[in-house]
Amino acid sequence: MSMQDPIADMLTRIRNGQAANKVAVTMPSSKLKVAIANLLKEEGFIEDFKIEGDTKPVLELVLKYFQGKAVVESIQRISRPGLRIYKKKDALPKVMAGLGIAVISTSKGVMTDRAARQAGLGGEIICYVA
């Protein structure tokens, strides 16, 4: 059976992995998942990520903890296959008054809400991370 929402699966694996104090989580890889993982690493929400395998690539995320607590407090899917959420550049949300990030898929690639505002781009709101 095929997976309906691979991005929601990725976010759930991160949430469950940190709840269980796992060092790393693995999942099937895709270009969008790698772009999201790269953003999470740049923003300091995960330690690192790597892609393994050629025929069926697997994405491994190394989770980050601070003083025994997970760095990611909440991770929430916003736009989903059944209900896509798009926002214009002036309507992009601020997550936790700027402490968290919104991952936005724009015409120039996947970026944070801050970067999209600076570039003057709107797009699909993939998820919130705080």
From Swiss-Prot:
Record GO cellular component, one term: ribosome
One GO molecular-function entry: structural constituent of ribosome
Stretches that traverse the bilayer: none
Signal sequence bounds: none
Keyword RNA-binding appears in the UniProt entry: yes
Annotated InterPro entries: Ribosomal_uS8, Ribosomal_uS8_CS, Ribosomal_uS8_sf
Keywords: Ribonucleoprotein, Ribosomal protein, RNA-binding, rRNA-binding
PROSITE patterns documented for this protein: RIBOSOMAL_S8 (PS00053)
Biological processes annotated in GO: translation
Family the UniProt entry places it in: Belongs to the universal ribosomal protein uS8 family.
Record's subunit section: Part of the 30S ribosomal subunit. Contacts proteins S5 and S12.
Annotated function: One of the primary rRNA binding proteins, it binds directly to 16S rRNA central domain where it helps coordinate assembly of the platform of the 30S subunit.
Protein name: Small ribosomal subunit protein uS8
Organism: Serratia proteamaculans (strain 568)
